[in-house]
Amino acid sequence: MTNIRKSHPLIKIVNESFIDLPTPSNISAWWNFGSLLGICLILQILTGLFLAMHYTSDTTTAFSSVTHICRDVNYGWIIRYMHANGASMFFICLFMHAGRGMYYGSYTFSETWNIGILLLFTVMATAFMGYVLPWGQMSFWGATVITNLLSAIPYIGTNLVEWIWGGFSVDKATLTRFFAFHFILPFIILALAIIHLLFLHETGSNNPSGMTSDTDKIPFHPYYTIKDILGLLLLILMLMLLVLFSPDLLGDPDNYTPANPLNTPPHIKPEWYFLFAYAILRSIPNKLGGVLALILSILILAVVPLLHTSKQRGMMFRPISQCLFWLLVADLLTLTWIGGQPVEHPFITIGQLASIMYFSIILILMPISGIIENHLLKW
């Protein structure tokens, strides 16, 4: 009799995706982040579901309902902080996962890569709308500033912003629809993640060497299930250290003040994981130009496969490209720091230089380094 995991229509899909999946024998810990992202997503959906049971999406009671969750609901505080800090963990894993894709040339799987970019946009939209829900000062003003950027679109901009707001300012209608979207989007993300995996399993995984590994595959279980569990334990350790010891470390103190349309906070800034894009947005004095730069800062990932000039897939044996890659990482950290600073003299210039650097490395320097390294191979 055939084993049930190989014959049952449903279990067979799970078996081919997580048990008998042929996997390269040499993939490193950088390949752990995909499974960690899946776990983060499930964690966010579950904690979010329990929060939604007690949350009210009304401007008069939203702030109070979040306070009620933290004070009166059984273990409400831990659910709320796991959800808030879980988002930070989600983005750390996302950046690591995308960075690994860039470093090892995984972007040559163009369908998987493009679905990944779409996933990144969707997760960013979800996180932004989630940040609005507690209805604190930074929630309200963050929503006002970011949605207002759409008014830079010629001709239809103003109408578009008012349509999204559901009125002439960020108010009850905005909060209600943001809650609805914030609830539905994670399930769309889940569907996209399944498509992402579907495309990946068409080609099989890449590996650190960038060479084909068809001759050297091992089953996913038990080798990589054990490896993923180790990654999961480290993720949970980091998350719980944050949640239990300094839950507000990554948040903004202004969000503990109820939203007040008559009082603007001195520095309006998004959560830390958007600061790099926010810095790029602010570095351009023109409103429409800034919005375009903001969108392009993520959309630029779509042209990375087109700009691949090297004969080698990954950067494992390409020292010049490696230097540029780590320069790009340092540049993104600089942009993240600048995004959290006030718009004053040294920070403006640093932000502009870092923004130019960001686009230059990806669009100009990386392709040139690939060509140079091709010539070095002939020596």
UniProtKB/Swiss-Prot annotation:
CDD domains: cytochrome_b_C, Cytochrome_b_N. A ubiquinone binds at H201. The lineage of its organism: Eukaryota, Metazoa, Chordata, Craniata, Vertebrata. The gene is MT-CYB. Its main location: mitochondrion. It is found in: Mitochondrion inner membrane. Keywords: Electron transport, Heme, Iron, Membrane, Metal-binding, Mitochondrion, Mitochondrion inner membrane, Respiratory chain, Transmembrane, Transmembrane helix, Transport, Ubiquinone. The cytochrome bc1 complex contains 11 subunits: 3 respiratory subunits (MT-CYB, CYC1 and UQCRFS1), 2 core proteins (UQCRC1 and UQCRC2) and 6 low-molecular weight proteins (UQCRH/QCR6, UQCRB/QCR7, UQCRQ/QCR8, UQCR10/QCR9, UQCR11/QCR10 and a cleavage product of UQCRFS1). This cytochrome bc1 complex then forms a dimer. InterPro entries: Cyt_b/b6_C, Cyt_b/b6_C_sf, Cyt_b/b6_N, Cytb/b6-like_sf, Cytochrome_b, Cytochrome_b_C_euk/bac, Cytochrome_b_N_euk/bac, Di-haem_cyt_TM. GO terms for cellular component: mitochondrial inner membrane; respiratory chain complex III. Belongs to the cytochrome b family. GO terms for biological process: mitochondrial electron transport, ubiquinol to cytochrome c. This is Cytochrome b. Binds 2 heme b groups non-covalently. It comes from Hyaena hyaena (Striped hyena). The chain crosses the membrane at residues 33-53, 77-98, 113-133, 178-198, 226-246, 288-308, 320-340, 347-367. The keyword Ribosomal protein does not apply. Heme 1 (or BL or b562) is low-potential and absorbs at about 562 nm, and heme 2 (or BH or b566) is high-potential and absorbs at about 566 nm. Component of the ubiquinol-cytochrome c reductase complex (complex III or cytochrome b-c1 complex) that is part of the mitochondrial respiratory chain. The b-c1 complex mediates electron transfer from ubiquinol to cytochrome c. Contributes to the generation of a proton gradient across the mitochondrial membrane that is then used for ATP synthesis. GO terms for molecular function: metal ion binding; ubiquinol-cytochrome-c reductase activity. Heme b b566 binds at H97, H196. The keyword Membrane applies. Heme b b562 binds at H83, H182.
